[in-house]
Every structure is written in structure tokens, then in C-alpha cells.
Curated annotation (Swiss-Prot):
InterPro entries: Lysozyme-like_dom_sf (IPR023346), Transglycosylase_SLT_dom_1 (IPR008258)
Similarity comment: Belongs to the IagB/IpgF/P19 family.
Species in which this protein is naturally found: Shigella sonnei
Source superkingdom: Bacteria
Entry keyword set: Plasmid, Signal, Virulence
Organism ancestry: Bacteria, Pseudomonadati, Pseudomonadota, Gammaproteobacteria, Enterobacterales
Leader sequence residues: 1-17
Protein name: Protein IpgF
One Pfam family in the UniProt entry: SLT
Length: 152
């Protein structure tokens, strides 16, 4: 059932960024401002971003999903190209990954750091450095969002 809901949510037409961020955040109980902070850091909100890492792996789309997830994506009926052509899919998949890291580490900043640095015990310093950057971005984006809501 969970897989069906994930697939259904990802194929809802991309009606606008706000709708996509909010739906992914609601689905996985993650603030949409946090997802936006990650997208800003990872791709600068560039849905066409493709980056090659030092180890030769590639990251795709607005949320820079690593090709480590290729097999899992294919099992779900997706491809790396779809992460680029359907930015909402990228956002939902990133929220799903972040939720999985939160199950491992708890709903804290180390889970956010694992999104980028992975789960190796040797990478704890990198996780915390990444999380600090995301935290600053998150605070700014959340404050901007709150201010925009007041104007309505």
C-alpha cells in the first residue's frame, strides 16, 4: 500500500513547487522548508542538475539523488532521467530517503546530514557539517515563508 501511495503521489501533475514541497512534507512529516533547504544546497533549485562526484557516481535532479539509488528507482518503475524531467518525483523520493534516515537516527540533524554524507560511522563529521549548513538555510527559508504567509 505504501509503495502505491508513493507512486500515486509522484505522478500527480506537477502543478507548482509549493504544492509539491507541501505534499512531500506532509506525506513524510518533514517540514517543506527543510526539503527546500536541501534542494537549495544540493542543486540551487536547478531541476536539470546532473553532477559527477569525485568517486565517479552521479547525482540527478533538483534534490541530487545519487545513482546509488538506481536499482531501487528501477524497481519502483523510475529512472534517473525521470528525476530530472519530473522534479516533484525527485522531491518525493528525497523526502522518502530523509524519512528513512530519520528512522535510523531519530528526527534530528544527524539524519539530515546522512542525506548527503551517508551512514558510515567514519562520516559523522561530514554529516554534522552538512546538517549545520542545511540548518542555517532552513531557518532562513522558514522565516521567509512565514513572512510571505503574513502578506496574504
Amino acid at each position: 500500500m505504501s509503495r502505491f501511495v508513493f507512486i500515486l503521489l509522484c505522478f500527480i501533475p506537477y502543478l507548482g513547487r509549493a504544492d509539491c514541497w507541501d505534499k512531500a512534507g506532509e506525506r513524510y512529516n518533514i517540514p517543506s522548508s527543510l526539503l527546500k533547504a536541501i534542494a537549495e544546497k544540493e542543486s540551487g533549485f536547478n531541476k536539470f542538475a546532473v553532477n559527477v562526484n569525485n568517486n565517479g557516481s552521479k547525482d540527478y535532479g533538483i534534490m541530487q539523488i545519487n545513482d546509488f539509488h538506481s536499482k531501487r528507482l528501477r524497481e519502483m518503475g523510475y529512472s534517473e532521467e525521470m528525476l530530472i524531467s519530473h522534479p516533484c518525483l525527485s522531491v518525493h523520493y528525497a523526502a522518502k530517503l530523509l524519512n528513512e534516515f530519520m528512522m535510523m537516527y531519530g528526527r534530528g540533524w544527524e539524519a539530515v546530514g546522512a542525506y548527503n554524507a551517508g551512514t558510515s560511522p567514519k562520516k559523522k563529521k561530514e554529516r554534522l557539517k552538512y546538517a549545520e549548513d542545511i540548518y542555517r538555510r532552513y531557518l532562513r527559508i522558514a522565516a521567509e515563508s512565514k513572512q510571505n504567509n503574513r502578506r496574504i
